[in-house]
Amino acid sequence: MGLEEQLRLLPDRPGCYLFKDASGRIIYVGKARNLKNRVRQYFQSSRNLTAKVLAMVGQIVEIEHIVTDTETEALVLESNLIKKHKPKYNIRLRDDKHYPYLRLTLTEQWPRLVVARSMKKDGSRYFGPYTSSQAMWETMKLARRLFPLRTCNDPSRYPRGCLQYHIGRCLGPCLPDFDRHREYAEAVRDLQAFLEGRTQEVLERLRARMEQAAERLEFERAAELRDQIRAIEKVTEKQKIIAHTMVDLDVIAYARLYDEAGVQVFFVRQGKLVGRDQFLMSGADEMTGGEILAAFIQQHYSQTDFVPKEILVSEDLPDADVIAEWLSAKRGSRVALRCPKRGEKRALVEMVAQNAQEAMTERRQQRELELAATEGVLRELQAYLDLPRLPHRIECFDVSHVQGAEVVASMVVFEGGRPKKSDYRRFKMKVDQNNDFANMAEAVGRRFRRGLAERAAQVEGRVRDLEEGRVAEGGAEYGGKFADFPDLLIIDGGKGQLSYARAVMRELGVDHIPTFGLAKENELLCTEDRPDWIELPRGSQALFLLQRIRDEAHRFAITYHRKLHRRASTHSRLDDVPGIGPKRKKALLQHFGSLKAIREASVEEVAQVPGITLELAERVKEALGGPMR
């Protein structure tokens, strides 16, 4: 179906649209109040489109759409789809999956504060994400010092109390005669309020409890509460007062650097600045400031439990009313989303914007220093190996096996001296499992055959674009990661592996690529052009870079080999039966207890297992053997 036909079928309804390229990859996800009108705007006139959007439009061959009931639902769906597919042309938070959270386990009998790598719908209260693990651990340490909750995984292991109990940092729910249930519940509530920045509320509650304890002549308990109050006051006294009212708000501003945007968030709780965080967003070139902030708010607040009553931004947002409606639904009460133009709040926004600019300036300076150092190393390597061009892209191959079993190869890629993990590839050997030289030749051959095929597809795609008159600026992109050939190829091994790799490269017509073998034993290099071994100076940055690349290839191959080994060790003959997946396999083994018992059972007995039809039972018996009746 052509694009015009796909456009004609779009509904006049809210929802999300997904643009796909010739390979079926999703390259952009968007939302719309009216799908038909919004998507048609991309194809009606190129006059108002940026170069980046023109390039994207030139690659679209398929349009998929998902209808929603409301625009707010479309906004939530868009955020989830971007997170799942990571489309090339969407602006998105960088590396958000690595940011840790603090998790308050409210569903446990005795809740505790633990570190979590992701947020789940498990009834717990999550705080974060923390872009700095150091800040997260400092918060954890502080929380454990101020609020005496348990830190152990299993309270039943310490019937006499753990060390934290004996030093006064845990109320001791593990004790058989524990009777401080109310105090523990209060500590949980206070910790949650403290982590949400409601410090004044916590202090007021603690002071009230201290007075009540004194009235009941519970002087030891009153003293504990007094010490806790003093500790919290000492922690919070350095927090800067930036609002004269007891307000909770997040203040968000951004600064640009190349195709990135640095978004700074100041967290104000009860009028005090309790923290700030810096986030990086990729794909920000040609995006307006409002679009950057809108994308950040969608992605950031979809990953956090807490939404403040008010959010201040440095620029007006597109679809601000829809975003505010979504935030309000998430919070459970109205959220004000504002771009202040004057007064105290405008000054606050400008302060955050200044901090964002300073952070990105520092990042630019750091990047320039790193680039200068990296270019120096690459020039050093170019000189040592007499390369015709700077080795910006370096690829390295390694073969891994254990006694000839499960032989695998890895290909790692470094660009500009840094790993480019999106281009890493792994190969499971198909030909000669017991020949290291042949294995290396197979891996290198498969890499370049695929690369040549992708380059041919690129040419065909551009010719087709020219014929159809839909060439975007720069031309459409076709093919995959293999189409980029290296400036330098490293083979993990000696002259034998190198010789086999070069033979297959000559056969494919890619032998112009400089190729070297790197021997592990003495860190010497070999190449076809020189009879003697090449020794780079010990301690040189060029040698260190090659060692790092070689070690990364070895690590990547070993990781894949272990994965295959684990899979093989848990594989059973049931896995080879069509129609038997993990759930049915589990049901069969739970019912019969072993493969032997299944083999000895009749077809009718196997068919009695939930989810197993008579036809499936016959397949199972054919695969395992044993009596059919």
Swiss-Prot record:
UVR domain segment(s): 200-235
Entry keyword annotation includes DNA damage: yes
InterPro entries in alphabetical order: GIY-YIG_endonuc, GIY-YIG_endonuc_sf, GIY-YIG_UvrC_Cho, Hlx-hairpin-Hlx_DNA-bd_motif, RuvA_2-like, UVR_dom, UVR_dom_sf, UvrABC_protein_C
Localization per record: Cytoplasm
A biological process term (GO) from this entry: nucleotide-excision repair
Keywords assigned: Cytoplasm, DNA damage, DNA excision, DNA repair, Excision nuclease, SOS response
SUPFAM superfamilies, sorted: C-terminal UvrC-binding domain of UvrB, GIY-YIG endonuclease, RuvA domain 2-like
Record GO terms (molecular function): DNA binding; excinuclease ABC activity
Key word DNA repair present: yes
Known partners and oligomeric status: Interacts with UvrB in an incision complex.
HAMAP family xref list: UvrC (MF_00203)
Protein role: The UvrABC repair system catalyzes the recognition and processing of DNA lesions. UvrC both incises the 5' and 3' sides of the lesion. The N-terminal half is responsible for the 3' incision and the C-terminal half is responsible for the 5' incision.
Stated name of the protein: UvrABC system protein C
Lineage, highest ranks first: Bacteria, Bacillati, Bacillota, Clostridia, Eubacteriales
